[in-house]
From Swiss-Prot:
Coiled coil: none annotated. Its EC number is 6.3.2.9. The lineage of its organism: Bacteria, Pseudomonadati, Pseudomonadota, Alphaproteobacteria, Rhodobacterales. Pathway: Cell wall biogenesis; peptidoglycan biosynthesis. One of its GO terms (cellular component) is cytoplasm. This is UDP-N-acetylmuramoylalanine--D-glutamate ligase. Cell wall formation. Catalyzes the addition of glutamate to the nucleotide precursor UDP-N-acetylmuramoyl-L-alanine (UMA). ATP binds at residues 127-133. The keyword Cell division applies. GO terms for molecular function: ATP binding; UDP-N-acetylmuramoylalanine-D-glutamate ligase activity. SUPFAM superfamilies: MurD-like peptide ligases, catalytic domain, MurD-like peptide ligases, peptide-binding domain, NAD(P)-binding Rossmann-fold domains. Keywords: ATP-binding, Cell cycle, Cell division, Cell shape, Cell wall biogenesis/degradation, Cytoplasm, Ligase, Nucleotide-binding, Peptidoglycan synthesis. It comes from Paracoccus denitrificans (strain Pd 1222). It is found in: Cytoplasm.
Amino acid sequence: MIPVQGVQNQTIAVLGLGRSGRATAAALAAGGARVVAWDDGVDTREQAEQEGLHLLDLTQDQNWDGISALIASPGIPHLYPKPHPVIARAYALGVPVDNDIGLFFRSFATAEWERFDTTPRVIAVTGSNGKSTTTALIHHILKETGRPTQIGGNIGTGVLSLDPAHDGEVVVLELSSYQTDLARALTPDVAVFTNLSPDHLDRHGGLGGYFAAKRRLFAEGGPDRAVIGVDEVEGRYLAGQLGMGAADDRVIRVSSGQKLEGFGWSVFARKGYLAEYRKGRQVASIDLRGIQGLPGAHNHQNACAAYAAARAVGIAPREIERAFHSFQGLPHRSQTVAEIGGVAWVNDSKATNVDAAAKALAAFPRIRWIAGGMGKDGGIEALAPCLGPVVKAYLIGHSARDFALQIGQTPYEIVETMEQAVARAAAEAQPGETVLLAPAAASFDQYPNFEKRGEHFTALVKALQA
């Protein structure tokens, strides 16, 4: 646990008592704060009270006397479509609102660091797609090359549940737009921006607000190094804002398709090869073809971002290459779960938006596509240029009929459920084809989250093997 600094003898309120909220309360208490807490769920409140938390109904004005700050758990709306009533009350009373990410950054450095030979560092990763894989890959590279490292944030362990940093340790964090938007302190040593595509727009008031939330990771004087995916205009804009010209090597531009030779520092992938350029000269190259944990162009973009971040903390190219080959990938992200009768079955349940689905569809030559769920704003008409490899679509969930109207001449069948989709695809798929779950939609109409959706798909496929 990382005790929160600067809260001794203050009364701090915590809103939301899931795993993150309870960890935040414990870290605040370890830092000497008096912690009061609230959650909208009766069962959650009862559980928290049994664990010794002091509950206080923060919906009542009279209970705010003496509260110095409100710490909100991830996922609780703090601005759009409208703030949670407790957060709105804090705003009205002038009580500062923060989250566990802000507390982490103000508490990460300790007096013990004066005895360290090498100062601990933080690499923080944000973006729309690929950030979990990029974060996990950076952590894997560090671990495989013998660097002390921890991973947390939106992946793995909550930030305040991490251990205090050791000498020379590198902490790798995945940060969502919800987390970066609210945090009052964001000071990573290396910040990574993978890409931007429309997502969570209702929570940010539109695409501009969503991008602004991501950009906050690069504010406050900026990180020592910024790794920026420049395949979208927002990334090119951000790189231009952070750098003092094309030759500034504090910004490492990355791409999966563009040749980036005229910059101070760049990493890009073309035709299956990763290249690193410094001041116009190629200094390293890696053959990405055949690396099983990084299939497809979208994973080559992730590899470029992870490579750049690892280089920014001093890892040598050949060490990174060796780590690439031992990376197993993450569940629900281009995960091959079986090959049955010459047909590959791939779980990309994390492809919850159009951009992620487009990248998944580009990775295979002949696809039987399972798509649908809770559709997002704008539908999937933008996928039209990506549907050439699709032999047939099997449409499930709330958006099935809407998706059927948006996929042009692509053959389709509305099957409603995952069980039906897997059964129909199994009956019709031919050797050499890939059955791909890349829903281009959220899971909440039929599943609690994308993980449960992917686990259900995987279980159904495994049953075919039995």
